[in-house]
C-alpha cells in the first residue's frame, strides 16, 4: 500500500469538514491567517477536526527547558494560536493512545528526534472542560497536535523511492519510525480512543 500524492488545501476557502486530519507545516515568515480564516480553523477544531502543526525546526531549539518554545517556527505558531480557543496542552504522555494506536511507540521522530509531540491535556472525568469541548469528550481525539520534528521531511521521497531529505541525527530505523508515527496519528484521528 502506497500513499497517494498530497493535496494542497486552501484553509480560507476549501470545505474543511472533508478532512479529519490536516497537516500544517509552519513557515515562520508566512503572513498570519485572516480573522475569518482563523474563525474557520477554530470551528473546524471544535467540531472534531484535528490539525497537526509541524514547526519543522526542532533541530534549532536551544538545549534545556523551554528551548523548543523559542524557535522561529514556534514563535510563528504562537502568533496563529493566540487568536484561537486552544485547550491546555501537554507533551504526549507515555500512556497516551497515540503511542499504541497501531504501532507501539515510545516517541515520535521525524527528520529530527529532539522535539516533543504536544496534545490536548487530558481533563479529569468531572472537569467542566469536557462539557465545553463536546467533540473531544465524545471520541478522545486531541483537536491539536504540535511537533517540531518535520514529519513530512522524513516521509518525502524522490520519484525513484529514495529519501528526499537527510535525517538528523540519522539514527537506525529513524525514517521507519517516522512513518509509524504518521500511521498512528492518522489512525488516532480517524478512530479516536477506540
Question: Across the structure, where does each feature detected by a protein language model lie?
Answer:
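Aromatic-Pro/Gly-enriched surface loop or interdomain linker
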Residues: 1-21, 28, 151-152, 159-194
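Sec/Tat-exported extracytoplasmic proteins
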Residues: 26, 45, 49, 81-88, ...
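Helical hinge/lid and interdomain linker segments adjacent to catalytic or ligand-binding clefts
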Residues: 1-72, 147
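Glycine-rich loops and low-complexity Gly/Arg-rich segments
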Residues: 46-49, 115-116, 168-172
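An acidic, glycine-rich "communication" segment
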Residues: 59-161, 174, 179
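Solvent-exposed, polar/charged alpha-helical surfaces in well-ordered, non-transmembrane soluble domains
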Residues: 39, 43, 75-79, 183
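Short, low-complexity, polar/charged sequence segments that are solvent-exposed and flexible
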Residues: 41-44, 108-111, 162-168
Amino acid at each position: 500500500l502506497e500513499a497517494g500524492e498530497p493535496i494542497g488545501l486552501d484553509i480560507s476557502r476549501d470545505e474543511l469538514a472533508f478532512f479529519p486530519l490536516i497537516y500544517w507545516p509552519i513557515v515562520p515568515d508566512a503572513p498570519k491567517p485572516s480573522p475569518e480564516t482563523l474563525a474557520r480553523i477554530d470551528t473546524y477544531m471544535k467540531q472534531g477536526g484535528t490539525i497537526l502543526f509541524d514547526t519543522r525546526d526542532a533541530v534549532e531549539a536551544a538545549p534545556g527547558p523551554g528551548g523548543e518554545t523559542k524557535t522561529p517556527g514556534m514563535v510563528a505558531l504562537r502568533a496563529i494560536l493566540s487568536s484561537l480557543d486552544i485547550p491546555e496542552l501537554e507533551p504526549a504522555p507515555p500512556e497516551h493512545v497515540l503511542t499504541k494506536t497501531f504501532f507501539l511507540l515510545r516517541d515520535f521522530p521525524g527528520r529530527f528526534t529532539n522535539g516533543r509531540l504536544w496534545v490536548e491535556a487530558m481533563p479529569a472525568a468531572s472537569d467542566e472542560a469536557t462539557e465545553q469541548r463536546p467533540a473531544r469528550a465524545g471520541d478522545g481525539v486531541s483537536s491539536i497536535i504540535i511537533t517540531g520534528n518535520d514529519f513530512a521531511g522524513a516521509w518525502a521521497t524522490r520519484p525513484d523511492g529514495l529519501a528526499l531529505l537527510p535525517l538528523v541525527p540519522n539514527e537506525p530505523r529513524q525514517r521507519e519510525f517516522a512513518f509509524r508515527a504518521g500511521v498512528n496519528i492518522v489512525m488516532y484521528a480517524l478512530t479516536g480512543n477506540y
